[in-house]
Amino acid sequence: MLEGYYIVENTGVVPAERRFKFKDLKAWGYDLHLGTIDGREAYFVSKAGTREEGETYTEGGKEYHISETQKEIPKNARLLARIVIEKGQPYLEFWLDTEDGNFPLAKEDPRLILHRFWTEKKFNQLEKHVGSVGLTTDFFKDRVFVKSIPLPYEEYPPKVRRVLREVRDVHRDLTGFGRFVFQYFGEEDKTHQYRLWWLLPTIHLFDVEVSNEVDKILAMLD
């Protein structure tokens, strides 16, 4: 992609952490419980549908007892998460920030959670075109079937320009950071020919609404 490309770029700061909603936690595949860990009151998670209220179990050398499975984020609490890189591998850490302190919930491979989450939500574009996942995640999509020269922006049709506007809206309103590189080669047999590369902050992709918007944009020219 060395020539004839159009860039939509917002050079904001990649966020270290952000707040999420209960529906996001459910989309990741977790249930949130109030109970005890080794006899001390705590919040913790389990894989969705695998544990029941009143159940006591041992995991990782600790004893868990579930008093109540939550149906929403507790009052005056926040669900927070961040991406960290350790020994060259990314992890999603998330925890519950409450008036009584922080309760670590899990530290998981973000690639596995995104795969589970995107598959369940049928975000097929994200699943198909994702490249690498770290503090940022990149997507690459190549729909060029006949070799030709990329067109200048002035020759982009309205539908293609709309895609670029939608990308700007995502960067401005949802992620605050992003780089979208686009080449357009015109139409062949009523099919848009294009190539794109999109870099976004990984942490924002764990938001159901953000992933939904990105998935829709990636499908707009198909």
Curated annotation (Swiss-Prot):
Source species taxonomy: Archaea, Methanobacteriati, Methanobacteriota, Thermococci, Thermococcales
HAMAP family tied to this protein: UPF0128 (MF_00264)
Domain of life the protein comes from: Archaea
Family in the record: Belongs to the UPF0128 family.
Name of this chain's protein: UPF0128 protein TK2294
NCBIfam families for the chain: TIGR00703 family protein (TIGR00703)
